[in-house]
Amino acid sequence: MGVCIDGASLSIPDVVRVARRAAPVSLSPDARRRIDRASAYVDTLLRRERPVYGVTTGFGRFADVVISPDDSATLQRNLLLSHASGVGELLPDEVVRAILLLRANALSCGYSGARAEVVDTLIAMLNRGVHPQVPSQGSVGSSGDLAPLAHTMLVAIGEGTARYKGEVLPGAEAMARAGIPVVALRAKEGLALINGTQVMTAIGSLAVHDVSILAQVADIAAAMTTEALRGTTSAFDPRVQAARPHPGQAASARNLLRLMEGSGIRESHRNCPKVQDAYSLRCAPQVHGAARDAIEYARHVVEREMNSATDNPLVFPED
């Protein structure tokens, strides 16, 4: 099953399918129209020669330095080259794939000003298995994953290195072998490619998915322990959960009852005179439920972030 990105509806399961199972990716027609509109507006700003951060000016401390339209493409290319300064072990290919997907989705919001050609290139890299080599250390966090995103995007412009069909190659060669034309960046596009939180969001997406599985495994372990110790399921009664209605607790209790449904061991001691089980058994839903609630909170934060535009500046085309 493929994943169609539109800048608004991407989910953690979508990220997992693309990152780990190589699900094909496409761009929605509505997203393409938004992208084209914002890109055209950047061209308009460039012609007006108005001071726009990162478009007609330098970056950071050089924000007051005026850049001529003739130099805008060089400015964007140099931005990627200068920020590719990461160190440390390389990120796994599955994380790099998630990064490419999330940055393409962020650009699809239509507030970045990059052309659809840039997004199409990132999607082609995903679909054809071109995986940039990205050092794991160097992000500045809330100000953006500038360094790791720069390493990721270098390959799109024919620089850096990438893994393609198991072989690590110069970026230009990897793109050529995959049959993907490299991008000649235009105004705003280098900044649009690296000014975001997609590296931390990619790692967070996969982590939330994996820890959700661990929450299920924890319930299985609790159910097996209750069975082995001939415990009672009375503490998992829905009425108990309704009296203290934390969502995660109720979900864990329901799961425990489902896991032990029809158990011969459970039936054999249904009328056992024991008053209650050990705390570690009867309070499993409360403990596991707190973890479930935390995971659900993280899920909402990550999915909200992955469907957000994180650029500076944002582009709001004039009506």
Where are the regions that the model predicts?
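Disorder-to-helix initiation segments
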Residues: M1, V182-A207, C272-H288, D319
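N- or domain-start disorder-to-order transition segments that initiate the globular core
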Residues: M1-E49
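Acidic, low-complexity proline/glycine-rich segments
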Residues: G2-I12, M175-N195, N255, L259-R270, ...
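Short, hydrophobic/aliphatic alpha-helical segments
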Residues: A31-P51, T121-S136, A178-V183, K188, ...
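Glycine-rich loop at the start of a catalytic domain that most often binds anionic cofactors/ligands
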Residues: R61-Q76
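Active-site cavity-forming subdomains of large catalytic enzyme subunits
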Residues: A84-P92, V96-H246
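Accessory "access/gating" subregions that flank catalytic or transport cores
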Residues: T226-D319
